[in-house]
Amino acid sequence: MLDQQTINIIKATVPVLKEHGVTITTTFYKNLFAKHPEVRPLFDMGRQESLEQPKALAMTVLAAAQNIENLPAILPAVKKIAVKHCQAGVAAAHYPIVGQELLGAIKEVLGDAATDDILDAWGKAYGVIADVFIQVEADLYAQAVE
């Protein structure tokens, strides 16, 4: 789990996510597709162009930050998203790429306001959240095989 300092930093970024979340996630997707074009087929590009997907991701990241001390509270949303991930063919191997590009987008959008402490905290938080998604998706993939 996350240490208290990390939790405090994540909670302190909630107002920033409310203000800049969609810009961060739009930048994230732009960079993800430019640097990792192999993941493009996993995404509905119409939802990208309409900003529906960046808005949805921004809301998910915000919900995770708001519930960082009680991540089980977002498990119902995680399960719904995981079903979509499994339908699209998302694999555990994609999560490190996503984490790298998400942190890069935070830095790109926030500039110097994205301190090393903030980026480190979000790196740790992303790791915990990604592990939850990976486990839920592994369970779904296993059920599909049965």
Curated annotation (Swiss-Prot):
The record, for PROSITE patterns, names: GLOBIN
Manganese: is it a keyword of this entry? no
> What organism is listed for this UniProt entry?
Vitreoscilla stercoraria
Q: Name one GO molecular function term.
A: metal ion binding
Q: Can you list the disulfide-bonded cysteine pairs?
A: none
* The keyword Nucleotidyltransferase belongs to this UniProt entry's keyword annotation: no
Its domain of life reads Bacteria
Pfam families named in the record = Globin (PF00042)
Residue positions binding heme b:
Q53, H85
Q: Which SUPFAM superfamilies match?
A: Globin-like
The cross-references to InterPro entries, in alphabetical order and at most eight, read: Globin (IPR000971), Globin-like_sf (IPR009050), Globin/Proto (IPR012292)
What protein am I looking at?
Answer: Bacterial hemoglobin
Its function, per the record, reads: This protein functions as a terminal oxidase.
User: Which residue numbers delimit the Globin domain?
Assistant: 1-138
Give GO terms for biological process: cellular response to nitrosative stress; nitric oxide catabolic process
Family affiliation: Belongs to the globin family.
Q: How does it assemble?
A: Homodimer.
- What keywords are annotated for this sequence in UniProt? Heme, Iron, Metal-binding, Oxygen transport, Transport
